[in-house]
Amino acid sequence: MDKSAFQKQLAALRDHRSAAPASMRQAFAADPQRFQAFTATDGDLLLDWSKCAVDATTMDLLEKLAAAADLEGRRAAMFAGKKINITEDRAVLHTALRNLSGTGVTVDGQDVKADVLSVLDAMGAFADAIRSGKALGATGKKITDIVNIGIGGSDLGPAMATLALAPYHDGPRAHYVSNIDGAHIHDTLKGLSAETTLFIVASKTFTTVETMTNAQTARDWVQKALGKQAVGKHFAAVSTALDLVAKFGIEADRVFGFWDWVGGRYSVWGAIGLPVMIAVGPRNFRAFLDGAHEMDQHFRTAPLAGNLPALLGLVGWWHRVICGYPARAVIPYDQRLSRLPAYLQQLDMESNGKGVTLDGTPVATPTGPLVWGEPGTNGQHAFFQLLHQGTDFIPVEFLAAAVGHEPELKHQHDLLLANCLAQSEALMKGRTLDEARAQMLAKGMKPADVDKIAPHRVFSGNRPSLTILYRKLDPRTFGRLIALYEHRVFVEGTLFNINSFDQWGVELGKELATGLLPVVEGKESAANRDASTRGLVERIHQLRGSE
């Protein structure tokens, strides 16, 4: 990053903010080609940011900012396997997991392509064996249910993907257990049979407390129903700790590895995606990878002015840093993407929720926004009130497919799309006091009532939103969408000048929880804890004593 040039562009963008479009209605009225000017496509994916308060000057300044931040250099370093995760001295190469082409991928001078393909082939063989019934349970019955036990990136990605690709399921049912709360695994197991259930334990070190606690509960459940000798037929692992996996009772040919150059929240493309592959089959899983690789190539080669991840990141940075918007709402008008907001919470907030720059100095601008959302139209009947009339402006990101998977329900899909477009239009246009009054008078309301109620029906408008449209949520398109958001996070992290690939905030909580466990169990005193923690522990013990 050229800090001097970056500061110059930052100042220019701040000065420009007051000259950017203040009224989106007027901006569209003044420029009939505004939609064409502020949309970009890649295949059937379309990104429309024309309803955001930007103009040609804004985009030009943002492109210059990206140049000052050396976005192209950072991007090249990532794809080349340079150790851009500086706090852990690691390369960042989740993109290698979906690069099935003939080109090699180098880490520390070694081509890792063969290892990636070897794991993928092993996953495919195992998935086919489970799906076909070649690999049976201990009593000779076919596996009908898969339970993935993991947390964070070992759960959110595959759980989201399994739901997103539901129309392509032709394998065993997939379930996900992540929470240390015993209710999660209890409720999951309640409807399953040990004879026909396979557990996948996803933990790189095989020491993650939440995951291993749930795995031990699952093993006890299998042993109680089928005996200790059955464990090997009902478990698989995604891990690199082969000794601990063997000690647990999982056979070596059921262990699938991954590498430290793949961060947890970027790991769905490899062995962590095993439950997805079993559910939808290796062919559909590879289509998912192919779509992501296509987006990788687009991100690497498309000029900035038409580069979807770069544009999404530039506009996101503009909203966060220059406009000062604290959050972004992700609203998929696609029910099967209902877990996308939760997935993006980890992808974005764990990556860019940082307070120091790459050189360890405090950041001088805001960094990652709060990310949240729910699927449309559900959100319209919950929190859209705040989006339309609340005191905070929150940029909204709409996602929608032109075609659904249920042709017999086309009318419902049309209603879904109409609602999506209407919300986007309403956020942009709003409704003036005069318009509210005219509408109420036209309905025959008394003037006195109109005077009283009209102010409550005013919408300021000018609330930014962008829309991502695609033809249909198939495996390839889904892969492209997720890779699009991954690279968007990278772009924003580059502009923030932070390390988007560590997560020390996660580690702190783990450390403290380890020390607090014996205190909660009553084995150690809480005397050396702060007054609040001490008081809460005492109250827990009191409440338990009342049982």
Swiss-Prot record:
Biological role stated in the UniProt entry: Catalyzes the reversible isomerization of glucose-6-phosphate to fructose-6-phosphate.
Residues of the active site: 350, 381, 510
Protein name, entry field: Glucose-6-phosphate isomerase
PROSITE patterns with a match to the protein in the record: P_GLUCOSE_ISOMERASE_1 (PS00765), P_GLUCOSE_ISOMERASE_2 (PS00174), P_GLUCOSE_ISOMERASE_3 (PS51463)
EC number assigned by the record: 5.3.1.9
Primary enzyme class: isomerase
Pfam families: PGI (PF00342)
Assigned protein family: Belongs to the GPI family.
PANTHER family recorded: GLUCOSE-6-PHOSPHATE ISOMERASE
GO cellular component: a single term: cytosol
GO biological process, one term: glucose 6-phosphate metabolic process
Catalyzed reaction equations: alpha-D-glucose 6-phosphate = beta-D-fructose 6-phosphate
InterPro entries from the UniProt entry: G6P_Isomerase, G6P_Isomerase_C, Phosphoglucose_isomerase_CS, SIS_dom_sf, SIS_PGI_1, SIS_PGI_2
Keywords linked to the UniProt accession: Cytoplasm, Gluconeogenesis, Glycolysis, Isomerase
